[in-house]
């Protein structure tokens, strides 16, 4: 019923989807009574369409309170996405239950984050290369200044702020761990490292695990909040069906 209500909402209030439905002869009544077996009849939305219309005709005329965020850009150019406040709250709870809980950590533990937010200009090579958010006990590390010359400052941020677990871009967390190892430095033992946004290879996982002496957990989906795939304590990548219905299609839009 929630899915039907959402589809009707897009027909009534979102110009982009209403036009797409009508071009295929899909009417409001069909959406109000759609069955799971009929989902394949709905048009899919491409990343290019999301980039082009995400801040215009894809927005609802009855927009609830929220804000714009950028996706990680792991598949190319970052996408500008509007996030309603209530969606952020619900997805935060899901992340706590299905990602952090499975990794044995929580949002109240001091954490380190390596993401796309620019906390200082890329050209500015002045310490520190992190900022501390006292309210969330979060140390936000710059993803744009990681190098052999700066890694000692990253390690200092982890130690001084008593970081218990790390999260963020897989490649950035790997580079931090790799440079720490190559510099012969010793990192504190963490509870877990949770990666996202980029492919985590076996080599990357091993080096991160060796340096921080903890398990590494992979996860996918965040900013878009349209699904959630996370790694369990058994090392399985699992889709959370209560977050959203996930369909797998190839580059031609055919089901696989």
Where are these regions (language model features)?
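Short, solvent-exposed polar/charged micro-motifs at secondary-structure junctions
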Residues: 40-45, 123, 227-229
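Active-site glycine/GP-rich loop and adjacent strand/helix microenvironment
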Residues: 1, 6-8, 133-256
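Nucleotide 5′-phosphate-binding alpha/beta core
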Residues: 1-70, 76-110, 117, 160-167, ...
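Flexible, active-site-adjacent loop/turn segments at secondary-structure boundaries
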Residues: 24, 37-40, 48, 79, ...
């Amino acid at each position: 019923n929630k899915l039907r209500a959402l589809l009707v909402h897009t027909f009534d209030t979102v110009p982009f989807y209403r036009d797409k439905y009508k071009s295929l002869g899909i009417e409001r009544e069909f959406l109000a009574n759609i069955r799971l077996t009929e989902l394949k009849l709905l048009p899919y939305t491409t990343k290019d369409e999301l980039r082009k219309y995400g801040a215009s005709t894809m927005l609802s005329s009855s927009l609830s309170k929220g804000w714009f965020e950028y996706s990680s850009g792991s598949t190319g150019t970052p996408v500008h996405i509007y996030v309603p406040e209530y969606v952020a709250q619900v997805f935060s709870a899901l992340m706590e239950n299905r990602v952090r809980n499975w990794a044995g950590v929580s949002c109240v533990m001091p954490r380190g984050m390596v993401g796309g937010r620019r906390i200082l200009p890329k050209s500015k090579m002045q310490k520190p290369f992190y900022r501390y958010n006292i309210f969330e006990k979060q140390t936000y590390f710059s993803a744009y200044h990681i190098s052999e010359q700066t890694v000692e400052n990253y390690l200092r941020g982890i130690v001084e702020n008593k970081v218990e677990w790390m999260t963020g871009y897989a490649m950035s967390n790997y580079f931090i761990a790799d440079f720490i190892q190559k510099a012969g430095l010793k990192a504190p033992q963490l509870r877990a490292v949770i990666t996202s946004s980029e492919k985590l290879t076996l080599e990357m996982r091993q080096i991160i695990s060796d340096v921080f002496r903890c398990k590494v957990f992979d996860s996918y989906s965040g900013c878009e909040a349209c699904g959630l795939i996370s790694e369990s304590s058994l090392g399985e990548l699992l889709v959370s069906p209560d977050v959203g219905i996930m369909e797998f299609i190839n580059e031609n839009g055919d089901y696989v």
